[in-house]
């Protein structure tokens, strides 16, 4: 009568096989894969918070020794509608590559915008880029975004719901978008303004 091997003996024999992966290592690998899946899902949730809008796509050329080299330039506005917005420019041989580079460039140049409880801006602000001048001022609830072109796109993706904007000077989309970014970057809350000036809020309003 032969003795049948127990489960522990069978498992130990499997572990002793050359090239076999131990049970503990298999469990650790399984746990690592689960953690990676959780991390990927969190990254997808973070990416889903961001929105991107293409303001302009142009076909541009560069004169080189062998002739003209054609490429595409994309102006992209990136924002999470929660007070963060950025403007990026991307160039590539195809449209998809140019947009992808524009999104990456926009996320590198983000600006934090202080929003009021009415989803407006705290104070009036001006911005300039090149020959473009942009004036933005707060508005009452229910006003909406009174702006046009690339300025409207920047304000909407920043999360501003009630604002008045005026474009002065150049009409180019890139300069106007950058001028709006300059105006938003200069915004300060009343508390931060009083702190920078070294006065109280009562003195600021008086």
Swiss-Prot record:
Superkingdom assignment: Bacteria
Ranges of Polar residues composition bias in the record: 1-15
Keywords of the record: Ribonucleoprotein, Ribosomal protein, RNA-binding, rRNA-binding
Region (Disordered): 1-50
Residue ranges of coiled coil: none
Domain S5 DRBM, first and last residues per copy: 50-113
GO cellular component term of the entry, any: small ribosomal subunit
Composition bias, Basic and acidic residues: 38-50
Pfam families xrefs: Ribosomal_S5, Ribosomal_S5_C
GO molecular function annotation: rRNA binding; structural constituent of ribosome
GO biological process terms on file: translation
Domain notes: The N-terminal domain interacts with the head of the 30S subunit; the C-terminal domain interacts with the body and contacts protein S4. The interaction surface between S4 and S5 is involved in control of translational fidelity.
Subunit architecture: Part of the 30S ribosomal subunit. Contacts proteins S4 and S8.
Functional description taken from the UniProt entry: With S4 and S12 plays an important role in translational accuracy.
Family named by the database record: Belongs to the universal ribosomal protein uS5 family.
Name the record gives this protein: Small ribosomal subunit protein uS5
Species of provenance: Prochlorococcus marinus (strain MIT 9215)
The organism's taxonomic lineage, starting at the top: Bacteria, Bacillati, Cyanobacteriota, Cyanophyceae, Synechococcales
């Amino acid at each position: 009568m032969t003795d049948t091997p127990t489960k522990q003996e069978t498992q130990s024999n499997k572990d002793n096989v050359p090239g076999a992966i131990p049970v503990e290592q298999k469990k650790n690998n399984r746990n690592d894969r689960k953690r990676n899946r959780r991390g990927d899902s969190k990254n997808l949730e973070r990416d889903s918070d961001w929105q991107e809008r293409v303001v302009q796509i142009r076909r541009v050329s560069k004169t080189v020794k062998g002739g003209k080299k054609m490429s595409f330039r994309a102006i992209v506005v990136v924002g999470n509608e929660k007070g963060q917005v950025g403007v990026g420019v991307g160039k590539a041989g195809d449209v998809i590559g140019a947009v992808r580079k524009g999104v990456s460039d926009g996320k590198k140049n983000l600006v934090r915008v202080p929003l009021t409880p009415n989803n407006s801006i705290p104070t009036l602000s001006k911005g300039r880029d090149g020959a473009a001048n942009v004036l933005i001022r707060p508005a009452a609830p229910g006003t909406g975004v009174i702006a046009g072109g690339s300025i409207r796109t920047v304000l909407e993706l920043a999360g501003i719901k009630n604002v008045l904007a005026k474009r002065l000077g150049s009409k180019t989309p890139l300069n106007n978008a950058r001028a709006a970014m300059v105006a938003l970057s200069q915004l300060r809350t009343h508390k931060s303004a009083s702190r920078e000036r070294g006065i109280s809020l009562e003195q600021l309003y008086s």
